[in-house]
């Protein structure tokens, strides 16, 4: 009983998951504790709690980015990947260093393939989203899906990850989220009968396996 699922798990650990047979790290995620309402002091206190619990990693979830439209909720800021100055005046580096001093690893939340209409990115590049020109846009979690068939969008998504890893090499983990299905299915970049290429290009983005 249950042998099929156990066989699948064994196959996944052996062939699909990186270091699948190693012990998994435990983590404390700030999301349920703070949602979007946090600052440096709250996060460092949660790190102390993580250390006390014997947890291996602290994960900073959604809400740490954007300044023109600060990420105070899920209705704005997605796409603008600079630290919110009011929440994190010393930047992500301050938090990675705090975690390092406490002997735990640091992870961070991203969702670079999505965008809020209320964001600087959308204001500059409305043509970067998947949408049907002759229909109203449909929003899921107040966001739209970026068109990864467009090389400029591919470069942008890669740049989000590359910039964080370059600036903050002590980031040990990305929680790469995907909070919207693909709606508004149409690419203004691709020619007719080529929209399946979105999926092909999604698979070439730098998402961890």
Listing of model-derived features with the role each one plays in the protein:
Residues 1-107, 113-115, 120, 140:
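Conserved structural scaffold segments of CAZyme catalytic domains across common CAZy folds
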Residues 40, 44, 85-89, 93, ...:
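Non-membrane alpha-helical structural segments and their capping/turn regions in soluble enzymes
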Residues 56-62, 159-189:
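Active-site groove signature of glycoside hydrolases
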Residues 68-69, 115-125, 181-191:
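Flexible glycine/acidic-rich beta-alpha junction loops that bind and position SAM and/or redox cofactors
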Residues 74-86, 188-201:
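Glycine-rich tight-turn/loop motif centered on a GG-T
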Residues 110-111, 209:
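Acidic carboxylate-rich catalytic motifs and surrounding loops in phosphoryl-/glycosyl-chemistry enzymes
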Residues 112-163:
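Active-site-adjacent "subsite" loops/lids of carbohydrate-active enzymes
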Residues 203-208:
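Conserved small/polar residues in nucleotide/adenosyl-binding loops
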């Amino acid at each position: 009983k249950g042998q099929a699922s156990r066989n699948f798990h064994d196959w996944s650990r052996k062939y699909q998951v990186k270091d699948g047979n190693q012990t998994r790290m435990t983590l404390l995620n700030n999301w349920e504790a703070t949602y979007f309402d946090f600052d440096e002091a709250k996060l460092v206190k949660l790190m102390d709690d993580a250390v006390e619990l014997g947890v291996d990693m602290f994960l900073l979830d959604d809400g740490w980015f954007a300044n023109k439209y600060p990420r105070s909720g899920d209705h704005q800021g997605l796409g603008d990947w600079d630290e919110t100055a009011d929440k994190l005046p010393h930047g992500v580096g301050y938090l990675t260093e705090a975690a390092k001093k406490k002997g735990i690893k640091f992870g961070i939340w991203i969702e670079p393939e999505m965008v809020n209409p209320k964001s600087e990115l959308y204001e500059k590049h409305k043509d970067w989203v998947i949408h049907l020109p002759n229909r109203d846009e449909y929003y899921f979690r107040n966001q739209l899906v970026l068109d990864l068939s467009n090389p400029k969008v591919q470069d942008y998504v890669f740049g989000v990850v590359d910039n964080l890893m370059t600036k903050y090499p002590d980031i040990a983990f990305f929680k790469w989220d995907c909070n919207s299905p693909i709606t508004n299915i149409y690419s203004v970049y691709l020619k007719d009968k080529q929209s399946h290429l979105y999926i092909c290009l999604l698979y070439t983005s730098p998402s961890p396996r």
